[in-house]
A protein has these predicted regions:
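Positively charged n-region of N-terminal signal peptides that target proteins for export
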Residues: 1-5
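Bacterial N-terminal signal peptides
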Residues: 6-16
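Sec/Tat signal peptide C-region and signal peptidase I cleavage site
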Residues: 17-21
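Short, solvent-exposed loop/hinge segments that bridge or flank secondary-structure elements
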Residues: 26-66
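A mature extracytoplasmic/lumenal domain signature
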Residues: 34-36, 73, 94, 129
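Hydrophobic/aromatic beta-strand elements that line small-molecule binding cavities or substrate pockets
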Residues: 58-60, 98-105, 125-128
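Contiguous, well-ordered beta-strand patches that form the walls/edges
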Residues: 62-99
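Short, exposed beta-strand-loop hairpins at the edges of beta-sheets
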Residues: 101-103, 110-124
């Protein structure tokens, strides 16, 4: 009996990622959590830290239906969305910054940048479908 339970648990674990792969195709809203942030100033070194240490949002919501990336204080429209080679590319502008977000359609991993003429923020993290 114990072997059947273990086998069933193993089968569910193996099926999990495949069942969730469709979550990252732009058809469902996502919650993204940047885990590591790098802040770089023009002509200076970069500083790395957690979102709280750097002062960036700890969670973002991507609302594909409303074409917006929603943070704790404001919402930013997605001006361009492109599907290519296993990833979604989202782009927009906000408060004088240009931003881009690349989402791995298989794993939900993300990399995002927010740049202006003085520097750039680079964020790495993961997304899930709530």
């Amino acid at each position: 009996m114990m072997r059947m339970v273990a086998a069933a648990a193993w089968a569910c674990a193996l099926a999990g990622p495949a069942a969730q792969a469709g979550d990252f195709d732009g058809s469902k809203a996502l919650i993204c959590a940047p885990a590591r942030v790098h802040e770089c100033d023009a002509g200076a070194n970069c500083v790395a830290g957690s979102p709280r240490e750097i002062g960036t949002p700890t969670f973002l919501r991507i609302d594909f239906e409303k074409k917006a990336v929603v943070g704790p204080q404001r919402s930013s429209p997605i001006l361009h969305l492109e599907k290519s080679e296993g990833q979604l590319l989202l782009m927009g502008t906000e408060l004088g910054f240009g931003w881009s977000l690349a989402l791995n359609q298989e794993t939900g991993d993300m990399a995002a940048t927010l740049a202006d003429r003085d520097g750039v923020f680079v964020m790495f993290g993961s997304c899930i479908a709530p």
